[in-house]
Design a protein with these regions (language model features):
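Carbohydrate-associated surface elements
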Residues: 121
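Active-site donor-binding loop signature of nucleotide-sugar glycosyltransferases
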Residues: 49-51, 235, 307, 487
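Generic beta-structure capping elements
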Residues: 46-52, 238, 362, 382
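N-terminal glycine/serine-rich phosphate-binding loop of ATP-dependent small-molecule kinases
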Residues: 1-114, 142, 248-256, 441-445, ...
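Short acidic capping loops at alpha-helix termini that bridge into adjacent secondary structure
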Residues: 39, 87-91, 115, 227-232, ...
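Active-site core segments that coordinate phosphate-bearing ligands/cofactors
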Residues: 5-17, 23-25, 125, 131-195, ...
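Short beta-strand-loop/turn "lid" adjacent to the catalytic site in phosphate-handling enzymes
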Residues: 81-118, 147-153, 186-209, 234, ...
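A conserved helix-loop-beta module that forms one wall/lid of the active-site cleft
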Residues: 220-238
Length: 513
């Protein structure tokens, strides 16, 4: 197969795909990944590096953008070395990224003016409270599909402009650039040649109108962000320029970009309305494809752009859960209750039930469907007989309980029952959690062959753009389910468990009595 890259707005060239691969870059919250994918959607090689996160004050979460970039370039080099597959055999590159995380940098020097403010950061809660009091919530929801919450990028940009010396003046002079992590990577990987984001990442900023598919002037004014700072918005499957030659000698093209959860949706081949996936990563993120319909949630979910490829926008309902895998990290790193994350499944299964103990991991407040930035984490129901296994089991179960709340909210919003749930992410390999999830939801839970569905989705978007794969039907043929978890819990026990969870959540909310 060959393709004339001139049809993609690139220089005229003919590329043969024989013996070639797609490289996917997944820039996550806790690590960055480079993956080489073959024509069957199988992972040939991977390289991963951890990314440091700092917590300068309670509720504040930051990362160094230059370290993130260096780590991403590092794994790009490493995966080529490990596999023996170099840039002359890379047909295209796809990028997926942690969403909402905000970087502002100087247009002249290319240097960030502040650390990246991570999606989990809650420092802008007072700004959000002021906007809610001003009645801005309906404007934001009607234009963006999102709720007013510190989670999204808009208030993070505003905070940087208001709190970094000289930032307001530089922004007014047109000297600053804003981007989510994808934009930061694209700008630097292309040597400053491309300043762009894709529709899915733009839709997570609370500055982008998902109806007009453009930055919204009213929202930019609301958050006091100059339009000159904003990147160009492009299709998720399309041309984002070439990687600079000092990074990859043969300068492969970047042809796919999507926020990590939308990339996961694409990697699961959820191309049709009603298809739903849940990613168990640092947080949990459940998305349902709603096709060309923007479903306005009445149950604490957000509407967002799900897939933006082949000249077509497919929207999605999303429920974002802020603490999932990060809860296991907290048990290990902060409390010393477990020595490794993999130990959690064994400990959780070592006791017959949760012994009436519930863990609400509201370390960064609660996301969907509660949206309470001031909720606080709690463990309740402890007795003298409780052990570390009790707490670990309650922590594992919390992922499934939170996902249950989101899925039921989705069903209420669309008026349909979800018949199965596709899952990915690191915690999807925890058999205890997946079985408990199936038991709570009372539907089959389908475990994919790889936990790296996000990277696969990024690869698919890039490969489609250059003709490496012909169409969506070919991608669907690649999809492989390795295990199905079927529900076994009695209805009586299920309701008993859920009643205890609901009571625990009420205690964690900021308005708890």
């Amino acid at each position: 197969m060959s393709l004339n890259l001139g049809s993609l707005g690139m220089e005229d060239a003919s590329f043969s795909f024989g013996g070639s691969y797609i490289m996917a870059l997944d820039c996550g919250t806790t690590s960055v990944l480079a993956t080489i994918v073959d024509e069957y959607g199988c992972i040939v090689a991977q390289a991963r590096r951890s990314v440091k996160t700092s917590f300068p004050r309670p509720g504040w979460v930051e990362q160094d953008p230059t370290e993130v970039l260096a780590s991403q370039i590092g794994v790009m080099m490493e995966v080529q070395f490990k596999s023996g597959i170099h840039s002359d055999r890379i047909a295209a590159i796809g990028i997926s990224n942690q969403r909402e995380t905000t970087v502002v940098w100087d247009r002249i020097s290319g240097q960030p003016i502040y650390n990246a403010i991570v999606w989990q950061c809650r420092r802008t809660a007072p700004l959000i409270d002021e906007l809610v009091e001003q009645g801005a919530e309906e404007l934001v929801r009607s234009r963006t599909g999102l709720t007013l919450d510190p989670y999204f990028s808009a208030s993070k940009v505003q905070w940087i402009l208001d709190n970094v010396d000289g930032a307001r003046e530089s922004a007014a002079a047109g000297d600053l650039m804003f981007g989510t992590i994808d934009t930061w990577l694209i700008y630097n990987l292309t040597g400053g040649q491309v300043f762009a984001t894709d529709y899915t990442n733009a839709s997570r900023t609370a500055l982008f109108n998902i109806h007009t598919l453009d930055w919204d002037d009213d929202l930019l004014a609301l958050f006091d962000v100059p339009r000159s700072m904003m990147p160009e918005v492009r299709w998720s499957s399309g041309d984002y320029g070439r990687v600079a030659s000092d990074i990859m000698t043969n300068m492969p093209p970047i042809m796919g970009v999507a926020g990590d959860q939308q990339a996961s949706l694409f990697g699961h081949c959820c191309f049709h309305p009603g298809q739903t996936k849940n990613t168990y990563g640092t947080g949990c993120f459940m998305l349902m494809n709603t096709g060309d319909e923007i479903v306005e949630s009445k149950n604490g979910l957000v509407s967002t752009i799900g897939i933006a490829a082949d000249g077509k926008i497919s929207y999605a309902l999303e429920g974002s859960i802020f603490a999932a895998g990060s809860t296991m990290n907290w048990l290990r790193n902060n409390m010393g209750i477990i020595s490794s994350v993999s130990e959690s499944a064994q400990l959780a299964a070592s006791i017959n039930d949760n012994e009436g103990c519930y863990f609400v991991p509201a370390f960064a407040g609660l996301g969907a469907p509660w949206w309470d930035p001031r909720a606080r984490g709690i463990v309740c129901g402890l007795t003298g007989a409780s052990s570390r296994a009790t707490i670990v089991r309650a922590a594992c179960e919390s992922m499934a309980y939170q996902s249950y709340d989101v899925l039921r909210a989705m069903e209420q919003d669309v008026g349909l029952s979800i018949e199965r749930l596709s899952v990915d992410g690191g915690a999807s390999r925890n058999e205890f959690i997946m079985q408990f999830q199936a038991d709570l939801l009372d539907i089959p839970v389908l475990q994919c062959e790889t936990v790296e569905t996000t990277a696969i989705g990024a690869a698919y978007l890039a490969g489609l753009a250059v003709g490496y794969w012909e169409d969506l039907e070919e991608l669907e043929q690649n999809a492989q389910i390795v295990r199905t978890f079927l529900p076994h819990m009695s209805a009586e026990r299920r309701e008993q468990n859920l009643a205890g969870w609901r009571d625990a959540v009420k205690r964690s909310l900021s308005n708890a009595q």
